[in-house]
């Protein structure tokens, strides 16, 4: 039935850590921590496919990722206290070959050199690990702590100064930069000790990086701090050290102080302050030296990337290039602020420099330049930074909406046409709109039409949104979606500074409403920028110009919304909220015509309802609940009232997480999925009693958390997708009381955590079916299934 399954897209955001990413200098592959996985991305791939794989293994948020220079190895660390060693199995995929379980607290810093890594732990210990050439495994060579009160490392940087002789720069919860030296011998680490404390910073040190100068024995060390300054330190060895006599009466200042020490009898080292770089308005997050030129890239919490280099005439370090945004204090992401940059990367490809940085929203921004003067912003990648809670295809199946606990609703669609209207050879998926940037965690979403959706956050109300003209034009241009009645669409949307509601940006907007929400009366021209796009929107456009205006709020629930569904005729909304009693565990029905509740509410359950599903013909409404019961409500098609028709008080032994209806041609059949690890099929029978009876059941090894049935039958069988709490996904065909396993998706392409939602697209493209997957591992994934 199914010939092959291909991951079409993986949308996942980067963790908010300063050492969360690195790039392989030869392969040009970016690895970054994304939740408890490591995402792999080729930023120069010509088709802009985005993340192509996620590496599983860690059990908590990944904090550090480093490629070992001049090798096929990568090192990662996590809040699970583990360090993992990875090795490339081919040009673009890695496999874990070693897990270091030595630590009892979070790993917060990593640095790597060929066959050598240093690890900083939140308990204050700093470890040096050496690789065994015979089996590629790393063994502990030395471990020490900085004896300076309460101190734990935040950043590390290793540098080889001579054969088998090394320096380790350490920054952390102290204003000083600590320098340790050691000798690598056949027997292990010798003479490892802290030899200098570089003074000057006024706050914690967050980033360190060594650079080898053209002259052998001459090095630069840069240090970035929360005091907003970057300091450069000159390191010289032996004959390069300034040994001129110093006047003992002369006042020693930080600017002329020399730190001198010996690594052994043959190697002397001198360190002095070289330069102070000022210009950033917030904490220094990440520093990167250029591969060949004397230039320094800095990413900071003021949402800027700046390239610094010495002036040819004066030698003073000046900013030669600034990228990012002009941020303002107190600005939120909803009003256009990125929330600062966390890590940055810098690499050269085909005589072009590429700058990468990740921000608060989990997205990656990319710029490219040939002359370091004019920069061209390139298409980056994006994704949620917290659990994806729900997904929903548009009725046409041409785009996918996803909600997340990161308080966003995102729209994903395939990039099919270029700006000139030509069809692209390979269609790739991208985030085309961010309809909702909210102040509450987002819980559920459902589309009403191709131009309207309803969502529920961690609040008591439902909100409805309409597609604006600018986004409609962009989707028509790049995706090929045709929308009717564009003239009636709102022009755009904005978020008031003190509000939660996306306001329509039209000239005739209600001024009283704007004043009530604390918004600005001026309507910015935010439609035109979208018409100028040559590719899918980038992060700054997603944050500012691609919101959808909110058209209605639906009230009635007493607690936070948990689930909702839209009737097939698009006339009704069914919703439920959190509850621990019968009074609040009711289903409320709203009309999409007048946005009013159709009373009475529907009581039956006693705990939180987990899923609501209308039958394909809209005549029945199915509810499943934490109380382990399911109920079936029959709809009066004339007045849209409901009556409890069928119920089962003991269908499962644990919570029922999900349910779905089979296609109408298969009969009156629905399927339930439960924490008791079972999937059960229920069919309507009129004899011996008019009821829904259990027709078949299948049990898995883990709790079943999501289920979805395709709208169409294939070879007179229904196609069922099943998701488990550990991220596994199964595909079954079902008929006549018999499950037949089609395939279990390969572990390499499935999520690393609970499947929160599975949804089949109604659309078939080029003989392929499309399955959307939302997961607690932060990812939204889209798979294509080629079938016979």
Curated annotation (Swiss-Prot):
It is found in: Cytoplasm; Nucleus. Coiled coil: none annotated. WD repeats lie at residues 13-51, 57-96, 102-139, 200-243, 279-318, 336-377, 383-422, 437-475, 556-600, 604-643, 651-692, 699-742, 750-788. GO terms for biological process: protein transport; protein urmylation; regulation of transcription by RNA polymerase II; regulation of translation; tRNA wobble uridine modification. GO terms for molecular function: microtubule binding. Keywords: Cytoplasm, Nucleus, Phosphoprotein, Protein transport, Repeat, Transport, tRNA processing, WD repeat. The keyword Transport applies. InterPro entries: Elp2, WD40/YVTN_repeat-like_dom_sf, WD40_repeat_dom_sf, WD40_rpt. The modification Phosphoserine is found at residue 492. Pathway: tRNA modification; 5-methoxycarbonylmethyl-2-thiouridine-tRNA biosynthesis. Residues 490-530 are annotated as: Disordered. The keyword rRNA-binding does not apply. Residues 507-517 have a biased composition (Acidic residues). Folds into a two seven-bladed beta-propeller structure which is required for elongator complex assembly and association with microtubules. Component of the elongator complex, a multiprotein complex which is required for multiple tRNA modifications, including mcm5U (5-methoxycarbonylmethyl uridine), mcm5s2U (5-methoxycarbonylmethyl-2-thiouridine), and ncm5U (5-carbamoylmethyl uridine). The elongator complex catalyzes formation of carboxymethyluridine in the wobble base at position 34 in tRNAs. It functions as a gamma-toxin target (TOT); disruption of the complex confers resistance to Kluyveromyces lactis toxin zymocin (pGKL1 killer toxin). May also be involved in sensitivity to Pichia inositovora toxin. Component of the elongator complex which consists of ELP1/IKI3, ELP2, ELP3, ELP4, ELP5/IKI1 and ELP6. The elongator complex is composed of two copies of the Elp123 subcomplex (composed of ELP1/IKI3, ELP2 and ELP3) and two copies of the Elp456 subcomplex (composed of ELP4, ELP5/IKI1 and ELP6). The Elp123 subcomplex forms a two-lobed scaffold, which binds the Elp456 subcomplex asymmetrically. In the complex, ELP2 interacts with ELP1/IKI3. In each lobe, ELP2 is tightly sandwiched between ELP1/IKI3 and ELP3. This is Elongator complex protein 2. It comes from Saccharomyces cerevisiae (strain ATCC 204508 / S288c) (Baker's yeast). The lineage of its organism: Eukaryota, Fungi, Dikarya, Ascomycota, Saccharomycotina.
